[in-house]
Amino acid sequence: MKKLTTLLLAGVLALSCVACGGKETKDDPAKKSEGVMTYAEYDAAALESEVVIEAYVQAKQGWWEKEGQGVVTIYAQDKDGAYFIYEMPISKEENDKLTAGTKIKVTGYKAEWSGEVEIIDAKYEVLDGNYVAEATDVTSLLGTDDLIKKQNMFVAFKGMKVEASKDADGNEVAFLYKWNGSGAEGDDLYFNASVNGKTYTFTVESYLCGSDTDVYKAVKNLKIGDTIDMEGFLYWYDGVNPHITSVTVK
């Protein structure tokens, strides 16, 4: 679910989503410059405090202009954890250079929105280095207190069963446009999937993977009862609400 704000997306979404392609090239994500927090230090930092991190861009939502200033929201990760960098000011030209794997240093403030920990008011610097994370399988952590420790990481869910959602008319369907079924083509997709007798909700965030992407099309083709594997980012909104970037029907 999005924050309640009017978003004027500029042009076509500029995606650098891991699931949408791009070659993985490795760097040592454990190295930190002087004065930069480790992930453990960032995790322990108080909300509203200034934080300084180094991480690698894994994906971006669409660049747009907010009150005349270009901004982009970034999913970033290092060896030990992940970061959600919200509406970072950046020009369109510079944003286009932030491809998946790019190393950045970010200074901003730690904040929280409905359980999602993020960095706001961010300033960035591009550094040498490149790293694209492999998906961490967190299927066994669903429903446990340990899942939140992986918040914002690129993760995988395996062997899950598509469960019915109910649309605005009360019909059972495999997915919804928007969380309540009130949307249309191009909006976020919501769908339910279960494992070990428990059902969870997953989202295709349209600002991350729009209607022209493989994952958006794949979710629209799901059938109730399908067994699927998924990859995406472990976003939080009043509980776990993963932003899915890849779906494979078994």
Label each PLM-derived region with a short phrase.
Residues G22-K250:
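OB-fold single-stranded nucleic acid-binding module
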